[in-house]
């Protein structure tokens, strides 16, 4: 799901942004943006010159100088307004999150069990390691891990999703978030953070962006903009002595004024992108939140735009994720009912969809009823990422089910033999895109349970789009190579990693990074944490464990693994917006040359009148028109900076050509039209 997006120019936000824009005139704020700080200084200088003219201390046109000074201040204010508007949208989102935080009470337990003695304490007094009981109707007082129990939890205040979710001890759905509400049953939870460090607190801090640091690309672009500003500053500074010399040599005209030089400098330096750069970064974070993804920093959003390798879990991302048992394929000498009986026993305590489907299929085929593990005096062996199998120990039987290679190792370690007929059955299931689970009883292989999964509709087309963009897709699965190859071919991914372990994921990420590539992945379990920490873009599922959320640099509140593709799109859109507006900003300097250079020097060098291709009314109106256009273009581009440029899936070279045509050519032509229209308005005002 996505959050409802606020209108860009919502009246309440605009009022707040206007006030903040004035507050940002503080020099301590302005110097952080070097390009706009030059405009800020130029505004102050022309204002002083205007005051000097009014007081008779110097000569010049008070109307012209005052008008230039006024529009230079507007340029600074418009840039401040763009940044304040972007920040205001983020702050409004943060306020809605802050409303989730309520003063609540907690039932603190003396021990980690349901019937332990309890005391009522303030949620703010809870510390990491404290254990609390949360019952139906209670607000979850802290972030933590479920130690005991299971409950239905309303997380709509955090995720925006109205459907309740199940949180229970063990597995990858054991994490609870402070501020959510338990709807039924009960949970015993161990707090995993101290006050002020909760997920909600971190969300608010991230969204507000109070301590937003510039990303590497922003820093690099800022250095480029500063370099251009210095070049234009030096070039403009040399024009004054050149003008004085030219007037004396030609005995014509008058030296160019400081006001005109300041106007020329401001129009030539990249004020458009300089004024919008910060707003673009803030808006990128805001758009990510609009997709219900919390990014820990702008660096993470930017990295998403540079990603060229996506590691995608098969289950839930590429396939629907609800694999169902469809067939029992017994080994030689084993009846189908014997295999079904053992498979059902091994799955009685397995709460996964696959495990439950095995129990149901055995019941449907052979009327095998569920049995109680306690009455059988059996011990359940849970699945782990390392062993890649689960099962049950009952009496003298050691029943295991799991991946082919895992069961093979288990059987051979017990001096058993893996039958060729079972290998053939495994290959048969795998070739059709199914997942074979092998069942063994000690050293004896009993047969194969076939699991069927379905590839999501439209996923192949999405992968084709990513391929056009130069992004490699890699499917990660615990299935054997044959199954993985069949599903990979059906889904259209570029590569796959079969029989994946946490160590294999980590090694694959490091391999791609060693090749200079940026890697993105999703994860929700504690076993995913090392790989999430290593990946350049790591999207942790909100439903996952605390360890996974701490290891990732983004959290998907919807817990939808497919969201990784949308995250990459948002990141690329932010980078494209920044690049497009930089191209536009630099390109529109050309028209300003044709406006200001003839106006400033035509009196001394009449030949320069040939450059007045726009036939502007007068030197004063030409200069003022360029300054006004330079200010207004920032306002007109604010929606584009906040929403992002339109994005289409294509190669980097094709995108570059497209943007050069739209924003490069547009940057050349739009100022000619804009400056001419403003000049016509000024001329009409002068004539009236």
UniProtKB/Swiss-Prot annotation:
Transmembrane segments: 34-54, 62-82, 219-239, 260-280, 594-614, 622-642, 667-687
Enzyme Commission code(s) on record: 7.2.2.6
Topology of this chain in the membrane: Multi-pass membrane protein
UniProt catalytic activity: K(+)(out) + ATP + H2O = K(+)(in) + ADP + phosphate + H(+)
Active site (UniProt): 313 (4-aspartylphosphate intermediate)
PROSITE patterns with a match to the protein in the record: ATPASE_E1_E2 (PS00154)
HAMAP family found in the cross-reference section: KdpB
Stated name of the protein: Potassium-transporting ATPase ATP-binding subunit
Species name: Yersinia enterocolitica serotype O:8 / biotype 1B (strain NCTC 13174 / 8081)
């Amino acid at each position: 799901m996505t959050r409802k997006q606020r209108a860009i120019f919502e009246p309440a936000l605009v009022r707040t942004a206007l006030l903040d824009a004035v507050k940002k005139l503080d020099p301590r704020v302005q110097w952080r943006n070097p390009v706009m700080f030059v405009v800020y200084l130029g505004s102050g200088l022309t204002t002083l010159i205007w005051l000097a003219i009014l007081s008779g201390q110097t000569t010049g046109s008070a109307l012209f100088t005052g008008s230039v000074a006024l529009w230079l201040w507007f340029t600074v204010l418009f840039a401040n307004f763009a940044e304040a508007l972007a920040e205001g949208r983020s702050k409004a989102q943060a306020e809605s999150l802050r409303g989730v935080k309520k003063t609540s009470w907690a039932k603190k337990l003396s021990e980690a069990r349901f019937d332990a003695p309890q005391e009522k304490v303030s949620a703010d007094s809870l510390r990491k390691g404290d254990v609390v009981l949360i019952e139906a109707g209670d607000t979850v007082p802290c972030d933590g891990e479920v130690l005991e129990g299971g409950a239905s939890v309303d997380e709509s205040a955090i995720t925006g999703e109205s459907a309740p979710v199940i949180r229970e001890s063990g597995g990858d759905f054991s994490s609870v978030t402070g501020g959510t509400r338990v709807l039924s049953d009960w949970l015993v939870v161990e707090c995993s953070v101290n006050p002020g460090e909760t997920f909600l607190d971190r969300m608010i801090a991230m969204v507000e962006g109070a301590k937003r640091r510039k990303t590497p690309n922003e820093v690099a672009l800022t250095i480029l903009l500063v370099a251009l500003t210095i070049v234009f500053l030096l070039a403009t500074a040399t024009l004054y002595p050149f003008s004085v010399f030219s007037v004396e040599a030609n005995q014509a005209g008058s030296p160019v004024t400081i006001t005109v030089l300041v106007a020329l400098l401001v129009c030539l330096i990249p004020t458009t992108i300089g004024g919008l750069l910060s707003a673009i970064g803030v808006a990128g974070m805001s758009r990510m939140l609009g997709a219900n993804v919390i990014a820990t920093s702008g660096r993470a959003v930017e990295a998403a735009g540079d990603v060229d390798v996506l590691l995608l879990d098969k289950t839930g991302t590429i396939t629907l994720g609800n694999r169902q048992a469809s067939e029992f394929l017994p080994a030689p000498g084993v009846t189908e009912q014997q295999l079904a009986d053992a498979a059902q026993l091994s799955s009685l305590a397995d709460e996964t969809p696959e495990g439950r489907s095995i129990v149901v299929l055995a019941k449907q085929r052979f009327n095998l009823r569920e049995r109680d593990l306690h009455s059988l005096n059996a011990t359940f062996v849970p699945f782990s990422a390392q062993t890649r199998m689960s099962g049950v120990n009952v009496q003298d039987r050691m029943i295991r089910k799991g991946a082919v290679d895992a069961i093979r190792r288990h059987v051979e370690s017990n001096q058993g033999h893996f039958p060729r007929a079972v290998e053939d059955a495994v290959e048969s299931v795998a070739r059709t895109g199914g997942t074979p689970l092998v069942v063994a009883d000690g050293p004896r292989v009993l047969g194969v349970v076939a699991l069927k999964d379905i590839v999501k509709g439209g996923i192949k087309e999405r992968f084709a789009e990513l391929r056009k963009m130069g992004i490699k897709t890699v499917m990660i699965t615990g299935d054997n190579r044959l199954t993985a190859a069949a599903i990979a071919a059906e889904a259209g991914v570029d590569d796959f990693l079969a029989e994946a372990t946490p160590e294999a994921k980590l090694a694959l990420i490091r391999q791609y990074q060693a090749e200079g590539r940026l890697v993105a992945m999703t994860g929700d379990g504690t076993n995913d944490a090392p790989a999430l920490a290593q990946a350049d873009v790591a999207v942790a599922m909100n439903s996952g464990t605390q360890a996974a959320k701490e290891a990732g640099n983004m959290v998907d509140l919807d817990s939808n693994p497919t969201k990784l593709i949308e995250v990459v799109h948002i990141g690329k859109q932010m980078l494209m917006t920044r690049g497009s507006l930089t191209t536009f900003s630099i390109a529109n300097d050309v028209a300003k040359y044709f406006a200001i250079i003839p106006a400033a020097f035509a009196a001394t060098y009449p030949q320069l009148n040939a450059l007045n291709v726009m036939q502007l009314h007068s030197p004063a109106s030409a200069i003022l028109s360029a300054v006004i256009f330079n200010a207004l273009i920032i306002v007109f581009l604010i929606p584009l900076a906040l929403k992002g440029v339109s994005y289409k899936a294509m190669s980097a070279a094709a995108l570059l050509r497209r943007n050069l045509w739209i924003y490069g050519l547009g940057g050349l032509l739009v100022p000619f039209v804009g400056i001419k229209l403003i000049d016509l308005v000024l001329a009409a005002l002068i004539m009236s």
